[in-house]
Amino acid sequence: FTNLSYYKTFDSRNGEERFKSYFAINANKRFGVGFYIDYLYGRGLYASQSTAFFNGGLFASYRGDKYNMHFIFNNDNLKMAENGGIADDRYITNPLDMAEGKKEYKSYDIPTNLNKVWNHNTSYHVFMTQRYNLGFHKEKTDSVTKDSVRIIQEFVPITSFIHTLQVDLNGRKRLY
């Protein structure tokens, strides 16, 4: 399974772009692996309002008779500019007074309270679970056609040992 998507809205000054990718494959009937990527970049309508989000992950699974494993790794990286709001409300409440003789002005020309202030959040998540089954094999008949019978070995689990690992790391930076 593969899916690639690209979205773009508005122009290069205040538009948004998003790229998404999903990939998964089964190597055989027991083992599968895949990844995903999601990247979003928005420039914002006002000054110092851009955002950049990157999310990605890897995953894998194995399902055997005696051993099972499921694994996932996620990474989230979020970077947002902070503008503290519009510096003077009259740009919204009385725009003609603030246009300085111009007929109109653009939203990104409106002064904001803050510039060059950023929030940067990152997080990493790992989850893995394993299971080992103890048991025995027994013979089972399997009819291939009307006139033939095949004997196969089937595993019968009696008890299991399970191990789970989870790690979550979160960080935040504020850049002025």
Give residue ranges: language-model regions:
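Short strand-turn segments of transmembrane beta-barrel domains in outer membranes
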Residues: 1-23, 44-45
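Transmembrane beta-barrel strands of outer-membrane/channel proteins
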Residues: 4-8, 37-39, 71-75, 159-169
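Sequence/structural signature of outer-membrane beta-barrel proteins
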Residues: 7-11, 40-45, 78-80, 170-172
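Residues on the lipid-exposed face of transmembrane beta-strands in outer-membrane beta-barrel proteins
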Residues: 21-25, 35, 58-64, 126-134
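Strand-connecting loop/turn motifs
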Residues: 28-30, 62-67, 156-158
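Repeated loop/turn-to-beta-strand initiation elements of outer-membrane beta-barrel proteins
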Residues: 30-33, 66-71, 137-140
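Outer-membrane beta-barrel translocator/channel fold
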Residues: 43-55, 59-124
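Outer-membrane beta-barrel transmembrane strands
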Residues: 111-165
